[in-house]
From Swiss-Prot:
The keyword Disulfide bond does not apply. This is Vasoactive intestinal peptide. It is found in: Secreted. It comes from Didelphis virginiana (North American opossum). The modification Asparagine amide is found at residue 28. InterPro entries: Glucagon_GIP_secretin_VIP. GO terms for cellular component: extracellular region. Keywords: Amidation, Hormone, Secreted. It comes from the Eukaryota. The gene is VIP. Its main location: secreted. GO terms for biological process: adenylate cyclase-activating G protein-coupled receptor signaling pathway.
Amino acid sequence: HSDAVFTDSYTRLLKQMAMRKYLDSILN
């Protein structure tokens, strides 16, 4: 299913963004 692939990649993208914000908050 393309939906499953999209959801998986979207979830991964959100995790990357969240991780980046988390690291930024620690470093700054």
